[in-house]
Amino acid sequence: YNILDNRLKKSGWLQKLSDDAVEVHVRSVFLQGLLLMNKNQRPSYFKRWSELWQKWHSWLSLRNITALEAALWFVLQEDLIDNVVVGVDSADHLQDILDALGEYHNITVTDFLSEDLNLIDPSHWKF
C-alpha cells in the first residue's frame, strides 16, 4: 500500500478487514525504495513512467516536502491501516524516517495512483 498503489482500499478489502476487526499492517510504503529515488538513481526500467516521475517530483517541490514525508504520511493518514512496516538500510535511514514523522502532512493526493502492475508490483520488475 503506497501513494501509487491503493488496490487494497479500492477493492473494498481494507474496509472489509476493518469491519471484521482485522488489524491491518502495510508494507512497501516506499515501493522498495522507488518512491524515494531521484531521477538519476532510478533504474532505466522505470523510464517508461518518466511523466509520472516528473509529476511526482514537481508535486513534492511545490509542497516543499520530501518523498519520504509524502510516502509515509499518505499511508499513515489512512484510518483503516493500523501499522506501517518499513525496512531500513542503516541507523541513519531509521533516523530519517523518525524525523519525517515529526511534522504532520495532509497527503490526500490521488493523482499518482496506478494499476500498472509493471510499475506497482515489484515481482513484475525487470532489470
Map each language-model feature to its residues:
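Beta/alpha (TIM)-barrel catalytic core signal, keyed to glycine-rich beta->alpha loops juxtaposed to Asp/Glu
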Residues: Y1-L117, H124
